[in-house]
C-alpha cells in the first residue's frame, strides 16, 4: 500500500465516531431486560449475539430464555450513549451510567436478568 493511500485510510479511521454507553437486551416475550455497558456500543451486540447463538453467554438465565424463545424474541437497544473522545475515565463513566439505569429500571428477579450487587 502506498503512503498516500495509507494516510487516507488513517484519516478516514480517525473520523469514525466510537460511542460508549448503556444498552439493554430485551426479551419481548416476557419483558425481562439485561442492562449492560460497553465502550463500543456498535460492536457489542455482535459479540453478545455470537455468545448467545453459540450457547456461551455468561448469564445463564438469559441464555436459557434465548434458547427457549429464540433470537427473534429479543431486541438490542442503546439507552444512553456518549462519544468516547471527550471522556477522561471511561470505566468510571460507564460504571456510573450503569448504576443510574439499574436504579431506574430495577432489572432483577422477575423483571430482568441482572443480579443485584452487594453494596
Q: Could you say what each language-model-derived stretch is?
A:
Residues 2-35, 39-119:
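Structure-specific nucleic-acid interaction/processing domains
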Amino acid at each position: 500500500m502506498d503512503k498516500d493511500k495509507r494516510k487516507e485510510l488513517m484519516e478516514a479511521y480517525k473520523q469514525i465516531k466510537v460511542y460508549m454507553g448503556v444498552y439493554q437486551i430485551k426479551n419481548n416475550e416476557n419483558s425481562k431486560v439485561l442492562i449492560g455497558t460497553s465502550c463500543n456500543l456498535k460492536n457489542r451486540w455482535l459479540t453478545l449475539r455470537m455468545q448467545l447463538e453459540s450457547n456461551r453467554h455468561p448469564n445463564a438465565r438469559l441464555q436459557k430464555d434465548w434458547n427457549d424463545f429464540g433470537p427473534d424474541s429479543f431486541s438490542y437497544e442503546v439507552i444512553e450513549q456518549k462519544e468516547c473522545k471527550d471522556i477522561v475515565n471511561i470505566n468510571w463513566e460507564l460504571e456510573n451510567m450503569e448504576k443510574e439505569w439499574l436504579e431506574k429500571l430495577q432489572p432483577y428477579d422477575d423483571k430482568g436478568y441482572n443480579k443485584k450487587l452487594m453494596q
